[in-house]
Curated annotation (Swiss-Prot):
It comes from the Eukaryota. The keyword Nucleotidyltransferase does not apply. LRR repeats lie at residues 38-60, 61-82, 84-105, 108-129, 131-153, 154-175, 177-199, 200-222. This is Leucine-rich repeat-containing protein 69.
Amino acid sequence: MTERLLIKALSGGKNTKIITLNGKKMTKMPSALGKLPGLKTLVLQNNLIPKVCPELCNLTQLTTLNLGNNLLEEVPEEMKYLTSLKNLHLSGNRICRFAPGACDGLQNLILLNLNNNHLTQLPQEVSRLKSLTYMSINYNQLASIPRELCFLENLVELQLNYNQLICIPEEIKFLKKLQKLLLARNNIGVLPEELCDLKKLRILDIAGNIIQIFPSGFQDLKLREFYCEGNPLFLQQPVISTQQENVWSLQEITSRFVMNQLAENNPFLMDDIERYPQVRSMISQGKTCAICGQYFITVWLECVRFVPPPKDWKISKNLKLVPLQVLICSYKCFTQRDPNLFGIAQV
């Protein structure tokens, strides 16, 4: 049956645009495919193919390639020759790596599906997928998101459910077009404040992680759907506690002075600071007190404010209050807080 279909396709020559050989128990990719340079769509899913044939390199007009549910162990190097490729489906394989150079020629790729594989990391070369709009890598073993992925400026949807992620890079803020972010069932403990810079984000799923509190600007996101069930969120259960005022280090006192002077555009400091990269690095970690608005480095006491989720959010069941992180610089500011702001106690 497979042979007849190939013979028929070959007889069409340059006019053959689509080949579908789904579920044919094929153990190798037919090398004869290389004689169809005008091929646009190639579907070889649900077979037993362990690697692609070298002749795949000839299919430079191919726009859709489906090799899902085969036995591939890597994203092959031959992919770099498919310069017209827009849709690449590689789900349900045994992929644990990208071959060197695999991403080099995929500047037109729009959709990449790597669900249900064995990836533990992504290469820095993913940054070369400049047109990528939809990326799905659910059910893998990723421990981190490379910062390079965050420079895919056309990315609209990113799915990383059921991995082993423990954090999200601050560079997430550069995904300005991102509308859908799925991170369910990972090991994420903290969401970066930079997540709140994603003005186009509409769907966020962080269910089944270990998140206790959300960044202070979280409520400003224009979400339509938000799912967070299965996280150990802080609850509004006040207890009586005491907190002593700290004695600041000289570094903290100096940093606060410098940052607050820079905020006032002190011309002498602005010129001098350029000559001291270590100082610039240190004050780049500065935070703003939610009470007095002054800058500081060391968090004196982490606080939380409980707010109801916006009414237009479609949310997880039973989510009544969202715990938002609030940072305060001193005991003095803590005593001036509003009654809906609580210090986080270790009990």
